[in-house]
From Swiss-Prot:
Locations listed in the record: Membrane
Role, per record: Involved in the secretion of mesentericin Y105.
Membrane topology: Single-pass membrane protein
Entry GO CC: membrane
Record keywords, A-Z: Bacteriocin transport, Membrane, Plasmid, Protein transport, Transmembrane, Transmembrane helix, Transport
Family affiliation: Belongs to the membrane fusion protein (MFP) (TC 8.A.1) family.
InterPro entries, per database record: MesE/LcnD, MFP, Secretion_HlyD_CS
Protein name: Mesentericin Y105 secretion protein MesE
Record-annotated membrane-spanning stretches: 22-42
Domain of life: Bacteria
Length: 457
């Protein structure tokens, strides 16, 4: 029978509850419970590690090759300080220089020709030569030929005018002679009419050269015996005088007809000659203007070719467009040719305490899940010192498409970094280091679960 007094014995409890299984299982159980609870609630950072280098936040200039010619002089060097206008690369430029010089010579020749044409045009407008001497293109001779044609037209008009004046003078002389004859005839007619009047009125005329006719009539009339005889004498005398009057009147009419038959041309108009001169002037001006337009078109074409040739010639020299520090995208120092359009170098801004910096790095596409802008990064410089440079920053840009590098694909990331004045003194462009990007956090339970399931992101 079990003795109850043993229940109060410490030895009983010690032997019953402080055995080996009890001391091992309980702590292990508690440890497992703690680990499970820790893995469910405790979190760890999910990071992506990559290699990166420090670059400026803003590149001043990307310089590309401007010629396919062989390199004549190469002044490129990594981290070399350059000033604006410094020569970086020169290419061989034999053909480009000759072409530019020939085009310049042709353009100068065309400019001189157009200037001579303009002088020729203004000479025509002003009607006098504005050439200071012999024109090298012969436009002074062309103007002299034009003026000779104008002088010919003017001389023709002057000759016509002179001939007209001579003809008019001859006509006026003929008219004067006829009028003089008509005047004498009219005077005779007046005298005969006066005799006729005297016979009719039996009044003796005075100062009349034909008074003898009246005197003869008066004598016959006096010798007549009868009235009929007197009447007969009178009628005979009147008839004789009337015949003379009729003859003189006919002669006077003949003079009028002759005078009327002598015609003179009207005033000789110069408008026809002036019109011919004006037409000639317009033809010459139109011809000169057309030639000016043609030459100007040729000049524009040559200038376009010259501009292209000058660009080709200028393209044989690459100069720094900004002051800064050179960064070579690859080793360009020993290359003999830069294909046109390829990037030769970049110009970074001068490093000072105000220079904003970034870190450029590449993340494999296999680790890109969850990567986004605004995530924090930490940059640890590859420096052989006890305390390397550590910088923090934030992702600003992620390339929209992966980049193939050595048959592997990466996403390009650029993160802005925070740098104080002391840290600036330790930094140079191209300083390499390790970049750790914090993509987020997850519990330890989910972390190991993802490892077991093969999800490494």
């Amino acid at each position: 029978m079990f003795d109850p007094k043993y229940l109060e014995s410490g030895e009983f409890y010690q032997r019953r509850y402080r055995n080996f299984p009890t001391l091992i299982i309980v702590p292990i159980f508690l440890l497992v419970v703690f680990i499970v609870l820790f893995s469910l609630f405790a979190k760890r950072e999910i990071v992506v590690k990559a290699s990166g280098e420090i670059i400026p936040a803003k590149v001043l200039s990307d310089i590309q090759s401007t010629s396919n010619n062989a390199i004549d002089s190469n002044q490129l060097a990594e981290n070399k300080m350059v000033k604006k206008g410094d020569t970086l690369v020169t290419f061989t430029s034999g053909n480009e220089k000759i072409s530019s010089q020939l085009l310049t010579q042709q353009i100068n020749n065309l400019n001189n020709r157009i200037q001579s044409l303009d002088t020729y045009k203004h000479s025509i407008i002003d009607g006098r030569s504005e050439f200071g001497g012999t024109d090298q293109f012969g436009y002074d001779n062309l103007f002299n030929g034009y003026m000779a044609q104008v002088d010919t037209l003017t001389s023709e008009f002057n000759q016509q005018n002179s001939d007209k004046q001579t003809a008019d003078q001859q006509a006026n002389h003929q008219i004067d002679v006829l009028k003089q004859g008509q005047s004498k005839n009219n005077q005779q007619l007046a005298n005969y009419q006066a005799i006729l009047t005297s016979i009719n009125s039996n009044t003796k005329p005075t100062n009349n050269p034909y008074q003898s006719i009246y005197d003869n009539y008066a004598a016959q009339l006096k010798s007549a015996q009868t009235t009929d005889d007197k009447e007969q004498v009178k009628q005979t005398a009147l008839s004789s005088v009337q015949q003379q009057i009729d003859q003189l009147q006919t002669t006077s009419s003949s003079y009028d007809s002759q005078i009327a038959g002598i015609t003179k041309s009207g005033p000789l108009s110069q408008s026809s000659t002036l019109d011919k001169i004006a037409d000639l002037k317009q033809q010459q001006l139109a011809s000169a203007q057309k030639e000016i337009n043609d030459q100007q078109q040729s000049l524009d074409e040559l200038k376009a070719k010259q501009s292209s040739a000058n660009e080709d010639y200028q393209d044989t020299v690459i100069k720094a467009p900004e002051s800064g520090i050179l960064h070579l995208t690859s080793d360009k120092a020993t290359i003999k040719y830069f294909p046109k359009g390829t990037t030769v170098t970049q110009i970074y801004p001068m490093l000072n305490k105000r220079t904003k910096l970034s870190v450029e790095y590449y993340v494999p596409t296999s680790n890109s899940v969850g990567l986004k802008r605004g995530q924090n990064i930490r940059f640890v410089a590859n420096q052989n010192v006890t305390k390397p440079l550590i910088l923090t920053g934030t992702i600003k840009t992620i390339s929209s498409a992966p980049i193939i590098i050595k048959e592997e694909s990466f996403y390009k990331c650029i993160a802005s970094i925070n740098v104080n004045v002391r840290e600036h003194e330790q930094i140079k462009y191209g300083l390499a280091g390790k970049v750790t990007t914090t993509k987020g956090t997850k519990t330890w339970f989910n972390y190991y679960k993802d490892i077991l399931l093969g999800n490494t992101n």
